[in-house]
From Swiss-Prot:
Probably involved in the biogenesis of the COX complex. Keywords: Membrane, Mitochondrion, Mitochondrion inner membrane, Transmembrane, Transmembrane helix. CDD domains: SURF1. The chain crosses the membrane at residues 78-98, 293-313. This is SURF1-like protein. It comes from Caenorhabditis briggsae. The lineage of its organism: Eukaryota, Metazoa, Ecdysozoa, Nematoda, Chromadorea. GO terms for biological process: mitochondrial cytochrome c oxidase assembly. It is found in: Mitochondrion inner membrane. GO terms for cellular component: mitochondrial inner membrane; mitochondrion. PROSITE patterns: SURF1 (PS50895).
Length: 317
């Protein structure tokens, strides 16, 4: 409105002023056109720059993304059956955990029995009476029948005083006696019943197997001693048969030993405190129970992981 009013006033005044106003009006229109055109071109250019800065997606991009997100397990009879392999391995691993706990509790139970106070050996020497007393400490009174002694060998040392063991390949014991030896078994007549049982007096090196070499250490007369109740053992693998006729004994077969030596099928391990200097070393009760369950459970759980990864790789598409 103000611009039009200025033109009208200039026309009224007449003269060159009107022409100058017309020129000014023309310049103003050119300026407005240039301003509009520049703004449009600048906006278009910025739009092109933004388009260049935007990452260009390949035609297969969306398809690949879709494929990655759409991987699923192919459930079928075969996949379900194959899933049984890791499941089976896992169940065995869990079972070995329970076995490990049981074995550790058993070892602790046996150790606690050895540390209990000694009780009198019952008069009833039947297996049903003595089996619950295995690894229990008992007290007996009687006399040794040294003329009937025999040796079971080879046997390592298991007494508390030893520093090394023949079972792990040692060559010398702490008192410098060869670790190659055996256990000296001597029949023992009970004072109260007159029955004869077998007592493992302890470990001897091979050069003391001759009865004359340890005769001076043999207890004489009536003695009172503490010992550990043991039961018979199965013949270990790769161990030969006993040969009683030749006095060769490899393992503890109570029925066979009792029949051959005319005793009750009862076996006691003399306590370590019964050791006589220069004689058999008592305390040969071995409670090192085999315990491989940790290795077993590690194997089964590793197999579970491997088979599960193989299953996922096979059936996840």
């Amino acid at each position: 409105m103000a611009f039009r009013w200025a033109i009208q006033m200039a026309l009224r005044r007449g003269g060159g002023g009107g022409q100058r106003l017309l020129l000014t009006q023309h310049q103003h229109q050119n300026y407005q056109f240039f301003k509009t055109s520049s703004s449009t071109q600048f906006s278009t250019r910025n739009s092109q720059i933004l388009d260049l800065d935007t990452p260009q997606k390949s035609p297969n991009f969306s398809e690949n993304s879709k494929n990655k997100k759409s991987k699923k397990i192919e459930w079928s009879t075969g996949s379900i059956l194959m899933l049984g392999l890791p499941a089976f391995a896992f169940s065995l691993g869990v079972w070995q955990i329970y076995r490990l706990i049981w074995k550790l509790e058993l070892i602790e139970h046996l150790k606690s029995r050895l540390s209990q106070e000694a009780i009198e050996l019952p008069d009833d020497l039947s297996s049903s009476s003595l089996e619950p007393l295995e690894y229990c400490r008992v007290r007996v009174t009687g006399e040794f029948l040294h003329q009937k002694e025999f040796v079971i060998s080879p046997r390592g040392r298991f007494d508390p005083a030893k520093k090394t063991s023949a079972s792990v390949g040692s060559m010398l014991s702490e008192n410098e006696m060869s670790s190659h030896g055996g256990h000296l078994i001597t029949p023992f007549r009970l004072k109260n019943t007159g029955k004869v049982i077998l007592i493992n007096r302890g470990w001897l090196p091979t050069f003391y197997f001759d009865p004359e070499s340890h005769a001076k250490t043999n207890p004489q007369g009536t003695v009172i001693l503490e010992a550990i109740v043991r039961k018979t053992e199965q013949r270990p693998q790769f161990v030969g048969q006993n040969v009683p006729e030749q006095g060769v004994w490899y393992y503890r077969d109570l029925e066979q030993m009792a029949k051959w030596h005319g005793t009750e099928p009862v076996w006691l391990d003399a306590a370590y405190e019964t050791t006589v200097p220069g004689g058999p070393i008592g305390g040969q009760t071995n409670i090192n129970v085999r315990n491989e369950h940790m290795n077993y459970l590690t194997t089964w759980f590793t197999l579970t992981l491997v088979t599960m990864l193989m299953w996922i790789h096979k059936f996840r598409k």
